């Protein structure tokens, strides 16, 4: 199974990127949720504009689908400058990065998505560019090779990553502003869904928006994807308007339950409960039992289930929590009740 095959995958798809551009907010006052990040960035941007300086280099990290690319574009819009976008895997050689840097205008934003995937040789070129606005490049080969320095206009590097821990210390230390994006509340997601529906011209009531929001796993990208699929259902099997009942029927048909779990999530939890007595069980045993790759479970399925408190990682292996039993209407084993082996851990 590939992450992007799932309806509730947080990672984006090429076609969605095009569709999402139409509904992305362009200014900070249109940006919903993340109140601390929004307030801080408004302050930093206003200060930089007041001094007629480029904004400090900014690192944005957090789970996929929370709006890192959107925020990078908003920063450029608020600063009144252009944004040049690329990603870590695309910048294979120092020359690739040099070409982008030398085409920047003063105060422009260079956005690098998946910045944790930059190659070491490209990263070395980035250090003096970030710190001194200079580009060190080698001319010639062998004994005749020499280094020359090119001055760059002051610019803002905005880096986005889902894995901040994989950044090297020298790179991380060169960012003056570091922002973490958190999962969204159902209330904020409902506001996002309502806004998107308005832009797309979809009739929808507040309860319909909330029904979509509560199944979107705290992620705007998933919420907008579910909205498009519910729209299809409403147009074909309903009267076009998205109500709570229509959203509920559509999402049940799409196999997304009220917690945002799909078939793969439920299969993982039920396998642990039915075949391994709730655990502890090793990752390799789970992978063999459900026919998935180890890394798929670890990187795709587990994170949200752990974040929601349905699975625990213990020194002896994975264990489901009492929330998993309650979700399926099953009796809770004694070890998850008060005084049981996993009761204290389950409450943490």
From Swiss-Prot:
Locations listed in the record: Cytoplasm
Amino acids binding Mg(2+): 69
Protein name: Holliday junction branch migration complex subunit RuvB
Keywords, in A-Z order: ATP-binding, Cytoplasm, DNA damage, DNA recombination, DNA repair, DNA-binding, Hydrolase, Nucleotide-binding
Residues where ATP binds: 23-24, 65, 68-70, 131-133, 174, 184, 221
Function noted in UniProt: The RuvA-RuvB-RuvC complex processes Holliday junction (HJ) DNA during genetic recombination and DNA repair, while the RuvA-RuvB complex plays an important role in the rescue of blocked DNA replication forks via replication fork reversal (RFR). RuvA specifically binds to HJ cruciform DNA, conferring on it an open structure. The RuvB hexamer acts as an ATP-dependent pump, pulling dsDNA into and through the RuvAB complex. RuvB forms 2 homohexamers on either side of HJ DNA bound by 1 or 2 RuvA tetramers; 4 subunits per hexamer contact DNA at a time.
Similarity-based family: Belongs to the RuvB family.
Small ATPAse domain (RuvB-S): annotated span: 185-255
Chain spans, region Head domain (RuvB-H): 258-348
InterPro entries recorded: AAA+_ATPase, AAA_lid_4, DNA_helicase_Holl-junc_RuvB, P-loop_NTPase, RuvB-like_N, RuvB_C, WH-like_DNA-bd_sf, WH_DNA-bd_sf
Region (Large ATPase domain (RuvB-L)): 4-184
Cellular component aspect of the GO annotation: cytoplasm; Holliday junction resolvase complex
Domain of life: Bacteria
Domain observations: Has 3 domains, the large (RuvB-L) and small ATPase (RuvB-S) domains and the C-terminal head (RuvB-H) domain. The head domain binds DNA, while the ATPase domains jointly bind ATP, ADP or are empty depending on the state of the subunit in the translocation cycle. During a single DNA translocation step the structure of each domain remains the same, but their relative positions change.
Binding site for DNA: 294, 313, 318
Catalytic activity as recorded in UniProt: ATP + H2O = ADP + phosphate + H(+)
GO terms of biological process kind: DNA recombination; DNA repair
């Amino acid at each position: 199974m590939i992450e992007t095959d799932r309806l509730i995958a947080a990672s984006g798809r090429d076609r969605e990127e095009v569709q999402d551009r139409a509904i992305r907010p362009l200014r900070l006052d249109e940006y919903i949720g993340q109140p601390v990040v929004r307030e801080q960035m408004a302050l930093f941007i206003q200060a930089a504009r007041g001094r007629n300086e480029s904004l400090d280099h900014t690192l944005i990290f957090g789970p996929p689908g929370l709006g890192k690319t959107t925020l990078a574009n908003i920063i450029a819009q608020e600063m009144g400058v252009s944004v040049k976008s690329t990603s870590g895997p695309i910048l294979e050689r120092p020359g690739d990065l040099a070409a982008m840097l030398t085409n920047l205008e003063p105060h422009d934003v260079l956005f690098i998505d998946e910045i944790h995937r930059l190659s070491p040789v490209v990263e070395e070129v980035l250090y003096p560019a970030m710190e001194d606005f200079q580009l060190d490049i080698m001319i010639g080969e062998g004994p005749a090779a020499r280094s020359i320095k090119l001055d760059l206009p002051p610019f803002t590097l905005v880096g986005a990553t889902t894995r901040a821990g994989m950044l090297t210390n020298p790179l991380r230390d060169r960012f003056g502003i570091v922002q973490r994006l958190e999962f969204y509340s159902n209330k904020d997601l409902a506001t996002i869904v309502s806004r998107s529906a308005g832009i797309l011209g979809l009739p929808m009531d507040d309860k319909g928006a909330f029904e979509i929001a509560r199944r979107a796993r705290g992620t705007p990208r998933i919420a907008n994807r579910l909205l498009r699929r519910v729209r299809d259902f409403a147009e074909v099997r309903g009267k076009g308007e998205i109500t709570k009942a229509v959203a509920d029927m559509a999402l049940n048909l799409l196999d997304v339950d009220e917690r945002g779990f799909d078939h793969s999530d439920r299969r993982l939890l039920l396998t642990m409960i039915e075949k391994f007595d709730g655990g502890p069980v090793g990752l390799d045993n789970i992978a063999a039992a459900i026919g998935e790759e180890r890394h798929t479970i670890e990187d795709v399925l587990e994170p949200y289930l752990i974040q929601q408190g349905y699975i625990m990682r213990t020194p002896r292996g994975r264990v489901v929590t009492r929330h998993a039993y309650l979700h399926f209407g099953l009796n809770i084993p004694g070890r998850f009740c008060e005084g049981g082996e996993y009761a204290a851990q389950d409450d943490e």
